[in-house]
C-alpha cells in the first residue's frame, strides 16, 4: 500500500502513483453515475450479493398476490412473520459456519434437543432426574461437563460458562420459569456446539461427516427424551407461548419502529458522513439518503399496518407487531456488529477466505473454527424456542425433517457463499423470507407438501448454481 501523497519541501504536491485501490488516492467522492457503474461492474464480475434473492422475493410477492386474495391480508402477513422466524434464526447461526466454508447438518436436530430439554424441565417442574431417568440424567450431566472442558481448551469462554450454568440448573432442580427454560435451551445448544466444533477444529474430522453423524445422533436423543409418539406441551406457559404468538402493544410497536429505523438511519448516515470528513471514497449522498428513506418509509408502513386490527372474528382484537420481529432484529443487529465491527468478525472472514494465510497472520484458526459451531448451535437453540412456541409443543421429530435444509437454504438463497469468505447475516433474513413466502403462498393455493419441497429445492439449486457461477466469474476476472 502506498502512502498518502504529501507536499514536498518545495511546496509542490507529490505526484499520485500506485494501484487504484491505494488508500492514498482513494479520496474522491463518487457521483451517482459512477456508483451505479461500479455496482454494475461488480455484478458483471460475478459479485451478485443478495440481488438475486431480492429480485426473487419481489417476483414471489407479485405472483402470490395475484393468485390469492388472502396473501397480502394483515392476518397472513403476521402469520408469515411468525412462521418464518424460527428458520431465519437458525439460518443466522449457520451463516457463521458457512463463512468458513464449513457446513453444520446437525443444527436442526440440535435445536430439537434444546427444545426437548426445555420442555421437559417445564413439564417435570424442574425435576430432571425424574424426567430423564438415572442413566440418561448422568450421561447428560457428564456431556455438559465435557463440553465446558473442550471449550476451555480453546479459550472459548461462553462455551465454558453456559454449559456450567445449564448443569447447575439441572442438578439443583431450579423451579420452572419461562426465562429459566429459555436459558437452559441456550445452554444445551452451546454444549452441543462445543462438541461439534472440537471434533471439526481439533480432531480434524470433516464437518460434513461430523455433523451428519450428529444429525442422526441428536435425532435419536430427542426421541429418547420425549418417547415415541409423545409430545411435551408448552402452550400453558404464557411467556413461552407468546414468544411466537404474542404481539407488542401499539405504543411499543411504534417505539420499536423509532428505535430500529432511527438506529439504522443514524448508523448509515453516521458512517457515510464520517467517510466524507476523512476524505475517503463514499457513495453519493443522495443515494444514501434514498436508501435510508426507503427503509424508514417501508418500516413505518409495516408498523402502521401491523398495528391495525387483523382479527377475522369481529369480537376479537389482534393488533401490534409480533414479538418475533424485535427478536430477529436484535439478533440481526448483534450478529452484524460482531461480523462487521469486531476483530473476531474480521478473523472469521479471513479464515473463510484463506485459512493458511490467516494462520500465518497469527490468527488462531482452530479457535475460530470451533467458535462458529458454538455460535451456530447456540443460535439454533434460540430458533428452537421460537419454533416450539409457534406450534405450542415439542414433538419427537422437532428439528428434524426440513428444518435444517430450509435453514441452510435460507442462508444460501440469501447470498451467503457455500465456498466461504462471502456473506452477511442479512442474507439469512432475505433467504428465510423467500422460503417462508414459498411455503405460505403454496399453502394458500392448497398445494400439497410435496410441491412445497420440490419448489423450495429448485430455488435452492438455482441459488447454489448462481453462487458457483459467481465464484467462477470472480476467479476468471
Give short role names for the model-derived ranges.
Residues 24-91, 124-141, 168-181, 313-318:
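Membrane-interfacial amphipathic/re-entrant helices at transmembrane-helix boundaries
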Residues 61-67, 72-125, 143-156, 198-208, ...:
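Single transmembrane alpha-helix segments in multi-pass membrane proteins
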Residues 2-62, 143-157, 161-165, 230, ...:
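Cytosolic-side transmembrane-helix boundaries in multi-pass membrane proteins
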Residues 67-79, 126-130, 172-177, 222-223, ...:
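Inter-helical junctions in multi-pass inner-membrane proteins, predominant
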Residues 131-139, 179, 218-339, 396, ...:
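Transmembrane helix-bundle core of multi-pass membrane transporters
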Residues 344-369:
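Short cytoplasmic-facing helical segments at TM-TM junctions of multi-pass membrane proteins
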Residues 193, 373-380, 384, 390-456:
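Transmembrane alpha-helical segments in multi-pass inner-membrane proteins
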Residues 127-163, 172-215, 268, 272, ...:
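Alpha-helical transmembrane segments within multi-pass membrane transporters and channels
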Amino acid at each position: 500500500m502506498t502512502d498518502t501523497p504529501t507536499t514536498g519541501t518545495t511546496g509542490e504536491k507529490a505526484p499520485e502513483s500506485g494501484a487504484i485501490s491505494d488508500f492514498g488516492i482513494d479520496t474522491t467522492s463518487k457521483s451517482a453515475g459512477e456508483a451505479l457503474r461500479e455496482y454494475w461492474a461488480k455484478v458483471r464480475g460475478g459479485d451478485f450479493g443478495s440481488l438475486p434473492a431480492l429480485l426473487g422475493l419481489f417476483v414471489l410477492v407479485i405472483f402470490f398476490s395475484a393468485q390469492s386474495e388472502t396473501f397480502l391480508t394483515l392476518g397472513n402477513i403476521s402469520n408469515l412473520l411468525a412462521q418464518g422466524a424460527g428458520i431465519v434464526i437458525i439460518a443466522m447461526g449457520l451463516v457463521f459456519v458457512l463463512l468458513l466454508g464449513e457446513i453444520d447438518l446437525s443444527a436442526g436436530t440440535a435445536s430439537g434437543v434444546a427444545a426437548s430439554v426445555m420442555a421437559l424441565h417445564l413439564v417435570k417442574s424442574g425435576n430432571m432426574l425424574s424426567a430423564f431417568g438415572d442413566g440418561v440424567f448422568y450421561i447428560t450431566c457428564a456431556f455438559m461437563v465435557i463440553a465446558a472442558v473442550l471449550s476451555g481448551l480453546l479459550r472459548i469462554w461462553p462455551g465454558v460458562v453456559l454449559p456450567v450454568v445449564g448443569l447447575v440448573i439441572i442438578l439443583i432442580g431450579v423451579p420452572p420459569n419461562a426465562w429459566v427454560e429459555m436459558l437452559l435451551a441456550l445452554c444445551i445448544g452451546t454444549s452441543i456446539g462445543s462438541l461439534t466444533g472440537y471434533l471439526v477444529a481439533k480432531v480434524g474430522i470433516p464437518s460434513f461427516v461430523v455433523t451428519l453423524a450428529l444429525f442422526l445422533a441428536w435425532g435419536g436423543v430427542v426421541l429418547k427424551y420425549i418417547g415415541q409418539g409423545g409430545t411435551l406441551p408448552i402452550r400453558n406457559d404464557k411467556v413461552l407461548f407468546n414468544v411466537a404468538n404474542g404481539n407488542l402493544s401499539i405504543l411499543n410497536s411504534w417505539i420499536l419502529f423509532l428505535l430500529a429505523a432511527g438506529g439504522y438511519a443514524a448508523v448509515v448516515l453516521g458512517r457515510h458522513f464520517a467517510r466524507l470528513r476523512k476524505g475517503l471514497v463514499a457513495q453519493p449522498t443522495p443515494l444514501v439518503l434514498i436508501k435510508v428513506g426507503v427503509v424508514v418509509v417501508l418500516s413505518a408502513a409495516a408498523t402502521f399496518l401491523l398495528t391495525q386490527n387483523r382479527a377475522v372474528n369481529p369480537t376479537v382484537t389482534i393488533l401490534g407487531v409480533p414479538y418475533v420481529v424485535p427478536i430477529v432484529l436484535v439478533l440481526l443487529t448483534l450478529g452484524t456488529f460482531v461480523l462487521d465491527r469486531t476483530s473476531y468478525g474480521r478473523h472469521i472472514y479471513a479464515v473463510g477466505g484463506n485459512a493458511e494465510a490467516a494462520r500465518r497472520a497469527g490468527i488462531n484458526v482452530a479457535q475460530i473454527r470451533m467458535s462458529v459451531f458454538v455460535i451456530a448451535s447456540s443460535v439454533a437453540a434460540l430458533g428452537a424456542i421460537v419454533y416450539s412456541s409457534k406450534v405450542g409443543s415439542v414433538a419427537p421429530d422437532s428439528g428434524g425433517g426440513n428444518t435444517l435444509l430450509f435453514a441452510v437454504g435460507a442462508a444460501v438463497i440469501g447470498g451467503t457463499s457455500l465456498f466461504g469468505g462471502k456473506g452477511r447475516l442479512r442474507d439469512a433474513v432475505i433467504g428465510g423470507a423467500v422460503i417462508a413466502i414459498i411455503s405460505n403462498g403454496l399453502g394458500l393455493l392448497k398445494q400439497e407438501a410435496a410441491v412445497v419441497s420440490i419448489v423450495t429445492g429448485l430455488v435452492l439449486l438455482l441459488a447454489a448454481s448462481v453462487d458457483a457461477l459467481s465464484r467462477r466469474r470472480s476467479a476468471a476476472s
